[in-house]
């Protein structure tokens, strides 16, 4: 009887020791959590472009008379510009001439846009020109891969290093050729800025998004809903994610 009791006591002691070892080892078998610190960032969705501005421009006839109008002044039709010279139309006056005032809307193809500024005709003796409409066009080339997401009717902002943003609307997309896509934009207003622009390299700002950057490895889908796990005061909380911008390897 005594030996049975001793064997039972030894078994209980062994179980107690083994149980302690199992409990102590449990943390070793828990999955390791990888945590990241969330960073708030702003992402700009842009497309690099090169293009040409066209507008309604009326070159004034050559004159030896002293011109009386200041730069960028608004001129009414029939106003006296100089002795013996009256304005044939209303518009904004500028003395800036670049030899491309005769250009008209090109075919919306890559070769046509590349050749658009190949014919330069500098007016001789002219005191300047009138910009006779507040509307303008911008014909541009973009790499086809970058322009793949563009759709007619969408609005964007053209930014270049030496001018502020110009609001544009995409009116037409031409056929891609040699990895480039021709684009036709229209706009209005901002003529005090636009009247000095012709050939421009810049970027189209399609959108700007501010949010928390998350790598794809931190996201999972359940019942068609995208989630991530947020560690708050030592507890994991499943949190739905609304994607503002998908950069490929992070959102």
Predicted regions and their residues:
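Hydrophobic membrane-insertion alpha-helices, especially the h-region
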Residues: 9-23
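Exposed loop and linker-edge segments at protein-protein interfaces
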Residues: 67-84, 240, 251
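Short coil-to-beta transition motif at edge beta-strands of beta-rich domains
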Residues: 70-80, 146-159, 224-227
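Short, well-ordered beta-strand segments in soluble/periplasmic domains
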Residues: 95, 122-161, 166-174, 180-191, ...
